[in-house]
A protein has these predicted regions:
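Jelly-roll (double-stranded beta-helix
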Residues: 1-128
Length: 128
């Protein structure tokens, strides 16, 4: 899970807390864990990627200007959560307005380069 807008989100589990107070810092947890939420500073927006981990591997990465991310075979979403972003995917330029995304499916892997702005890349891969 990644906080994209706002600040001060804390997820409270029975025996620990999951600190999401700062935006764009990844936190992982078992989606089956019962949690409560604490909003310390008002409303927030988050990106959360959920999958059956017995069947799929998942990943959420943040890319800033200049970042090059290899996305292996699978399904990917390149999302611009805060402001517009420009990315290049295997040599093809794409402009994303704020809160818009590209869906990418690849059988052999692909390169995503962030030319401007900031993106989140969510990936889902079949387990071997």
């Amino acid at each position: 899970m990644r906080l994209t807008k706002g600040a001060g989100l804390v997820l409270l589990a029975r025996d620990h807390e999951i600190d999401l107070r700062l935006p764009m810092h990844p936190r992982r947890y078992d989606g089956g864990t019962p949690i409560r939420t604490l909003l310390e500073k008002g409303p927030v927006e988050v990106v959360n990627l959920i999958a059956d981990r017995a069947r799929f591997d998942i990943d959420l990465r943040v890319g800033k200007v200049g970042a090059e991310m290899f996305c292996k075979s699978g399904r990917h979403v390149v999302y611009a959560p805060v402001g517009a972003a420009q990315v290049e995917i295997d040599g093809h330029a794409h402009t994303l307005t704020e809160d818009h995304a590209l869906r990418v499916r690849t059988g052999s892997g692909t390169n995503v380069t962030v030319r401007d702005g900031q993106v989140i890349v969510g990936s889902i891969h079949d387990k071997p």
